[in-house]
């Protein structure tokens, strides 16, 4: 592909960057951006069907830039080819005097929200964008938070007083004006539309999430998702926390996923540090990840059934989830957010009784799952409410950057654990459930149930084949180092003290890790400048892409169908807003 780009656009228009990424990174000039991206999408040899991620970088305080093109800011386009299982990253350098790029939202539909986020966080303008407004920050916010000259400490700001004038401005910004959202008041027959706020505090919106609905009678003509109510500045926080002390924050990106969220961050840091962990560490990480996957899927399954009108499954599923939490707590000492993975290993070795607790759960859960299928999933009302509802195909899924069960329901056989195995998943025997070309609400639920069965299969293999050995690498950047190492000599004690107080110094470079998270593909793109903190931490979450697709899927349906659709997506707003 790179040779084809050189031949078509001229080698002099590209700069190849070295990194720890398996994917090539090409810097290109903004004048050929649209042509290059159009070629990547339509190329017959290797088509990059998915714009996987799109994010900005403030380069102004970065020291280790090697021979990179001169840039104050950089915009990175991460393309993903499902058919060839390959990636390509394009970077465009920008100077602060000209922070403008052409929008690519007409080529990749999902670029819309990503470009809005970049403008929101960095102030980079995308010309001809259909709706370039703030997306995560309040509309009356001043400044662009991910710029390096925007402080991450509240103590460095002036004192804040919420005056009556500020309150009025805040309330005014929340008022709904259809035209400002690109919506018409009347149809072609001059019939007036009704506009309805669904959320941000509706029980079926699954979090602080607002959808503005344009209705003609009961039919949804259009809708606009409004996100950002749960934004906590997770990427900004990473710039002030050490590589080690940021681990607890990863748990809370998708707060149901627990250790699953820690996996991509830890693996990306270990790539930067050059750490290879023992086999036992890999299997322990898989053990915890699959427990959390089942836990998350059970909540999804039970709340989906509840949204349709049946309450029993919620109470039953929470009994099962309690058993999982008891098992997780016995291993990690915590329940929802254990922050248990470490750079170079895990926090502790497995306790003595871990296998007996896991064995009991593996006996219990399969029968319980069959029970849910019989009492709810085969129910005629549930089938009629969800089968054929909110349906889309492979082309639409790829256009919107859909991953996970939503994509696999369209017949695309892609699971990161199988196609790009990490942490030793290549040593496990399990199947990837896929659908039959159309992803509707019912199919997405069926796939999640089958994914639980496959996770149980993986857990059984962890039980039977847990390796012997250490729970932590001997690498000097493993944090914290083993106690017997740090207590052996005063010099090593000093190293331990520095790593835990100031943080480990990670070599300068860039790394990337994607994983199959509970709700789709989650990834971390890390940039180290050779310091104890990350220079840039980019968190790509599946739910951000999934919610952007809502208007294209739900037009023509009614509100009750919207509730079924939202329940079938499987999202939490912390995963969307970060």
Curated annotation (Swiss-Prot):
Entry keywords, A to Z: Cell inner membrane, Cell membrane, Membrane, Multifunctional enzyme, NAD, Quinone, Translocase, Transport, Ubiquinone
GO CC terms: NADH dehydrogenase complex; plasma membrane
Pfam families: Complex1_30kDa, Complex1_49kDa
GO-annotated molecular function: NAD binding; NADH dehydrogenase (ubiquinone) activity; NADH:ubiquinone reductase (non-electrogenic) activity; quinone binding
Catalytic activity of the protein: a quinone + NADH + 5 H(+)(in) = a quinol + NAD(+) + 4 H(+)(out)
Coiled-coil parts of chain: none
Residue ranges of the region described as NADH dehydrogenase I subunit D: 192-578
Record membrane topology: Peripheral membrane protein
Keyword Cell membrane assigned: yes
Predominant location category: membrane
E.C. code: 7.1.1.-
Enzyme class of the recorded protein, top EC level: translocase
Entry-linked SUPFAM superfamilies: HydB/Nqo4-like, Nqo5-like
Region NADH dehydrogenase I subunit C, residue ranges: 1-167
Entries under InterPro entries matching the protein: NADH_DH_suC, NADH_DH_suCD, NADH_Q_OxRdtase_suD, NADH_quin_OxRdtase_su_C/D-like, NADH_UbQ_OxRdtase_30kDa_su, NADH_UbQ_OxRdtase_49kDa_CS, NDH1_su_D/H, NiFe-Hase_large
Disulfide bonds: none
Cell compartments where the protein resides: Cell inner membrane
Quaternary structure and partners: NDH-1 is composed of 13 different subunits. Subunits NuoB, CD, E, F, and G constitute the peripheral sector of the complex.
Family: In the N-terminal section; belongs to the complex I 30 kDa subunit family. In the C-terminal section; belongs to the complex I 49 kDa subunit family.
PANTHER family registered for this protein in UniProt: NADH-QUINONE OXIDOREDUCTASE SUBUNIT C_D, NADH-UBIQUINONE OXIDOREDUCTASE 49 KDA SUBUNIT
Family annotation (HAMAP family): NDH1_NuoCD_1 (MF_01359), NDH1_NuoD (MF_01358)
Entry-linked NCBIfam families: NuoC_fam, NuoD, PRK06075.1, PRK11742.1
The protein's name: NADH-quinone oxidoreductase subunit C/D
Designated gene of the protein: nuoC
């Amino acid at each position: 592909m790179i040779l084809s780009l050189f031949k078509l656009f001229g080698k002099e228009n590209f700069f190849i960057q070295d990194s720890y990424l398996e994917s090539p990174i090409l810097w290109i000039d903004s004048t050929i951006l649209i042509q290059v991206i159009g070629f990547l999408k339509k190329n017959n040899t290797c088509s990059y069907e998915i714009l996987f991620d799109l994010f900005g970088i403030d380069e102004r305080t970065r020291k280790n830039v090697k021979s990179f093109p001169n840039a104050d800011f950089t915009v990175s386009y991460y393309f993903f080819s499902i058919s060839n299982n390959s990636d390509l990253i394009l970077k465009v350098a920008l100077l602060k005097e000209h922070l403008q790029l052409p929008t690519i939202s007409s080529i990749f539909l999902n670029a819309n929200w990503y470009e809005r986020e970049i403008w929101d966080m960095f102030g980079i303008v995308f010309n001809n964008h259909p709706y370039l407004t703030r997306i995560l920050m309040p509309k009356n916010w001043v400044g662009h938070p991910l710029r390096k000259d925007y402080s991450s400490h509240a103590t460095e700001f002036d004192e804040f007083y919420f005056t009556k004038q500020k309150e009025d401005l805040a309330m005014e910004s929340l008022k709904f004006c259809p035209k400002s959202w690109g919506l018409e008041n009347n149809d072609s027959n001059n019939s007036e539309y009704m506009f309805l706020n669904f959320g941000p505090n509706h029980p079926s919106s699954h979090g602080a999430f607002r959808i503005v609905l344009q209705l003609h009678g009961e039919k949804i003509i259009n809708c606009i998702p409004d996100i950002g109510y749960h934004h906590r500045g997770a990427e900004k926080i990473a710039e002030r926390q050490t590589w080690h002390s940021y681990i607890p924050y990863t748990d809370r990106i998708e707060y149901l996923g627990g250790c699953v969220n820690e996996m991509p961050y830890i693996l990306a840091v270990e790539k930067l540090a050059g750490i290879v962990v023992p086999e036992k560490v890999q299997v322990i990480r898989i053990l915890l990840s699959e427990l959390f996957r089942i836990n998350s899927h059970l909540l999804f399954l039970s709340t989906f059934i509840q949204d349709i009108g049946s309450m029993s499954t919620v109470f039953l599923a929470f009994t099962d989830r309690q058993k999982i939490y008891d098992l997780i707590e016995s291993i990690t000492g915590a329940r929802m957010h254990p922050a248990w993975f470490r750079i170079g290993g895990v926090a502790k070795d497995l306790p003595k009784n871990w296998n007996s607790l896991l064995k009991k759960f593996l006996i219990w859960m399969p029968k319980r799952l069959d029970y849910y299928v019989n009492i709810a999933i085969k129910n005629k009302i549930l089938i009629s409410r969800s089968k054929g509802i909110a349906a889309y195909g492979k082309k639409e899924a790829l256009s919107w950057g859909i991953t996970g069960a939503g994509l696999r329901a369209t017949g695309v056989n892609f699971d990161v654990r199988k196609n790009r195995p990490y942490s030793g998943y290549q040593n496990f025997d399990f199947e990837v459930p896929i659908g039959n070309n159309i992803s509707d609400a019912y199919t997405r639920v069926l796939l999640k149930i089958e994914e639980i069965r496959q996770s149980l299969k993986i857990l059984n293999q962890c039980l039977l084949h847990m390796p012997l050995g250490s729970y932590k690498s001997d690498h000097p950047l493993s944090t914290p180092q083993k106690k017997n190492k740090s207590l052996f000599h005063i010099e090593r004690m000093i190293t331990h003290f520095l790593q835990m107080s100031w943080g480990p110094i990670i070599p300068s470079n860039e790394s990337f890790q994607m994983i199959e998270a509970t709700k789709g593909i989650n990834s971390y793109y890390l940039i180290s400048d050779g310091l104890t903190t990350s220079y840039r931490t980019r968190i790509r979450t599946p739910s951000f892409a999934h919610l952007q697709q809502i208007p294209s899927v739900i037009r023509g349906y009614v509100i009750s169908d919207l509730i079924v659709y939202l329940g079938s997506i499987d999202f939490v707003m912390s995963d969307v807003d970060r």
